[in-house]
C-alpha cells in the first residue's frame, strides 16, 4: 500500500513539473527600431545660408526627433539660396527622386515675394510642389509638413524699405500656404512670429544680418517638434 501511494505521489510530481515547464511566459523579442528617411525641400532657409550644417533646421529637427525616440536619418536636402517656387520645381525634376520618404518638409516662397511675383502664381506653383511632396511620401499627408515664410522685413537688410508692406505681403503668401495645406490635412507650422522677433533680438540672425542663426532655427524646431510627433506617432 505504501508503495502504491509513493508511486502516485511521484507521478503527480512529474506531471506538475511538466506543467510548470510548459507554462513559462512568452517573451516577445524586441524588434529593432527602423530609421526614417527625410526629404527637405526649400530655399536659403532650408539649406541654412550662413550657418553650420549642424545648425540647419532640418538637421536639428532630425536630431531632435531621434532624441525623442523617433530615429530619423540626416535629411536629403534639395534647396538653394534665392530659389523661387518654379526654380524649386525644376530642381526637383532634375533630381529624379525615386525613393519614398517617411518625412517630407517644404518651405518656399520668400523669393517669390521679394521679386514681386503674384500671389496667384505662387498658389499655382505651391499646389504643384505640395503634390510632389505628397508623391514623395507615398501619398500620406501625415508625413508631409510645411513651414510658413519668415519675415525678412524684420532684419537689418530691410532697412529703408517699407517693412509694413513686406509683412503684409508675407502674410498674404502664408495665408495661401495655410489654405492649401489645411485642405489636404497637411501640417502647417507658423514660424513667422519667431522670425519677427529678430527686429529686437539680432542674436537670432546669422552674420549676414538677413538669414536666421542656428539659435532661431532651434526655436523653429521647438515649435515643430510636438506637432510633428503627434502626426508621426498616429497608428
Where are these regions (language model features)?
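Residues that line or immediately flank small-molecule/substrate-binding pockets and catalytic motifs
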Residues: 8, 42-43, 108
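Sec-dependent signal peptide recognition
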Residues: 1-7
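Alpha-helical cap/lid subdomain in secreted, periplasmic
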Residues: 71, 90-235
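Active-site-proximal substrate-binding core of FAD-dependent oxidoreductases
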Residues: 87
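C-terminal motif of bacterial Sec signal peptides marking the signal peptidase cleavage site
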Residues: 11-14
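Serine-esterase "nucleophile elbow" of acetyl-processing enzymes
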Residues: 19-81, 91-99
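Generic short amphipathic/hydrophobic targeting helices enriched at N-termini
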Residues: 4, 16-18
Amino acid at each position: 500500500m505504501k508503495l502504491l501511494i509513493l508511486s502516485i505521489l511521484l507521478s503527480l510530481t512529474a506531471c506538475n513539473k511538466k506543467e510548470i515547464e510548459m507554462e513559462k511566459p512568452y517573451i516577445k523579442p524586441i524588434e529593432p527600431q527602423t530609421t526614417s528617411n527625410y526629404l527637405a525641400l526649400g530655399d536659403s532657409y532650408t539649406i541654412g545660408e550662413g550657418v553650420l550644417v549642424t545648425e540647419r533646421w532640418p538637421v536639428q529637427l532630425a536630431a531632435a526627433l531621434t532624441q525623442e525616440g523617433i530615429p530619423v536619418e540626416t535629411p536629403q536636402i534639395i534647396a538653394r539660396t534665392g530659389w523661387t517656387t518654379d526654380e524649386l520645381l525644376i530642381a526637383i525634376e532634375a533630381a529624379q527622386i525615386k525613393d519614398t520618404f517617411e518625412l517630407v518638409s517644404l518651405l518656399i516662397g520668400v523669393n517669390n515675394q521679394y521679386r514681386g511675383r503674384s500671389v496667384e502664381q505662387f498658389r499655382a506653383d505651391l499646389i504643384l510642389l505640395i503634390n510632389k511632396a505628397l508623391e514623395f511620401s507615398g501619398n500620406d499627408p501625415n508625413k508631409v509638413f510645411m513651414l510658413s515664410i519668415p519675415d525678412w522685413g524684420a532684419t537689418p537688410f530691410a532697412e529703408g524699405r517699407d517693412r509694413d508692406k513686406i509683412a503684409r505681403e508675407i502674410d498674404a503668401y502664408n495665408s495661401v500656404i495655410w489654405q492649401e495645406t489645411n485642405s489636404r490635412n497637411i501640417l502647417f507650422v507658423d514660424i513667422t512670429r519667431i522670425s519677427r522677433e529678430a527686429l529686437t533680438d539680432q542674436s537670432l540672425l546669422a552674420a549676414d544680418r538677413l538669414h536666421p542663426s542656428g539659435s532661431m532655427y532651434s526655436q523653429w524646431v521647438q515649435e515643430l517638434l510636438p506637432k510633428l510627433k503627434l502626426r508621426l506617432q498616429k497608428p
